[in-house]
């Protein structure tokens, strides 16, 4: 059996995150999502838009997600949380993957990347396209038309065709 792990702030959760979760889940039997806590988001952007409890509740309810876990790290990584997941669950899985969204690229200097390699966890990059951003949503830059256009461009770039007149109902 395989376990996929995704991490992030998810503040707020949007369709780009869901796409990443679906792609990560397609690679594994189970998907764990590490949700950064409010302190992390305070350091990153001043204050969270949604509390970690709200984000956890929404993420746990999503179909591809097996388990949502709040990050226990006190720095700006999820290394301690990854170590804990690996320690507790490694005996249950043949392979563990640490998956990153489409806007992330291989960065051998990132602490999580180095940790994964040392633990035997396989880093996976480029899951999904940058069709939406939490910061775009908060800034009010996403109208339905703009989002439909982004999704349509991604669908077209992948050689797929939408049969619906509108991607959203």
Language model features by range: what are they?
Residues 1-169:
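Nucleotidyltransferase catalytic core that binds NTPs
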């Amino acid at each position: 059996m395989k376990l996929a792990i995704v991490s992030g702030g998810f503040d707020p959760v949007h369709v780009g995150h869901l796409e990443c979760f679906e792609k990560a889940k397609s690679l594994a039997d189970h998907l764990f999502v590490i949700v950064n806590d409010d302190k992390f988001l305070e350091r990153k952007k001043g204050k969270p838009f949604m509390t970690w409890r709200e984000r956890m509740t929404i993420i746990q309810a999503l179909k591809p997600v097996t388990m949502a876990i709040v990050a226990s790290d006190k720095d700006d990584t999820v290394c301690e949380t990854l170590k804990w997941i690996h320690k507790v669950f490694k005996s249950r899985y043949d392979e563990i993957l640490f998956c990153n969204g489409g806007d992330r690229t291989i960065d051998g200097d990132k602490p999580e990347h180095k940790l994964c390699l040392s633990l035997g966890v396989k880093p996976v990059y480029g899951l999904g396209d940058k069709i939406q951003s939490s910061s775009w949503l908060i800034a009010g830059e996403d109208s339905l038309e703009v989002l439909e256009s982004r999704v349509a461009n991604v669908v077209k770039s992948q050689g797929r065709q939408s049969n619906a007149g509108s991607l959203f109902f």
